[in-house]
């Protein structure tokens, strides 16, 4: 399968398939496709896997698109402004992503829900307790809102990030939440013009 990510504000990925190659997406994920591609709806791993995906913010059912001839194209577009990132996962390699990040993948990628180890990180973090887990082998495409800044951490290195800004991480990253000491945050109605 050949792929190309196009567009800037509202990107899309075009997958060029040869006969027998497939790509998986959730219901409503496909934008357009050539003639010569068949579609099958499945739970992609059974009803329990489907329910797990539903808890992670995705659809219970997945659509599998398979090329019936060579050199056919199918496109998947982001549903909001941001970026599409491609991850080529090796056998057993795992990434964890925010809910609703999944766009499409090769059918060999295992898609499931991921519970944060520390329950406080889930309840007080902006992305919630349940995230998505993708395990290789295969390529997966994620749609993420806004601009992306990639940061690689050394062993034992800590990085403080405002809650809700963690989009994707490897399975070896330990995500926790800290409180800011000595601060009290509150809001009240305020005028639009500071002079009034």
What feature does the model see in each segment?
Residues 1-22, 27-94, 156, 192:
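Conserved loop->alpha-helix
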Residues 43-52, 115-120, 177-185:
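A cross-kingdom feature marking solvent-exposed beta-strand/loop segments within repeated
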Residues 186-191:
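Conserved small/polar residues in nucleotide/adenosyl-binding loops
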Residues 83-175:
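Surface-exposed interaction/gating patches
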């Amino acid at each position: 399968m050949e792929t190309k990510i196009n567009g800037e504000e509202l990107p899309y990925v075009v997958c060029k398939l040869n006969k027998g190659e497939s790509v998986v997406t959730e219901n409503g994920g496909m934008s357009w496709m050539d003639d010569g591609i068949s579609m099958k709806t499945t739970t992609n791993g059974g009803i329990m896997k489907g329910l797990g995906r539903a808890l992670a913010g995705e659809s219970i059912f997945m659509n599998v698109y398979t090329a019936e001839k060579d050199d056919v194209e199918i496109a998947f577009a982001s549903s909001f402004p941001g970026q599409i990132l491609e991850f080529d996962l090796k056998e057993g390699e795992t990434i964890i992503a925010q809910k609703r990040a999944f766009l499409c993948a090769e059918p060999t990628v295992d898609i499931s829900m991921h519970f944060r180890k520390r329950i406080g990180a889930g309840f007080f973090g902006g992305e919630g307790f349940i995230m998505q887990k993708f395990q290789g082998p295969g390529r997966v495409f994620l749609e993420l809102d806004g601009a992306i800044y990639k940061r690689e951490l050394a062993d034992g290195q800590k990085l403080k990030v405002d809650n809700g800004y963690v989009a994707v991480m490897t399975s070896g990253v330990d995500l926790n939440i800290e409180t800011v000491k000595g601060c009290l945050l509150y809001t009240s109605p305020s005028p639009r013009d500071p002079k009034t």
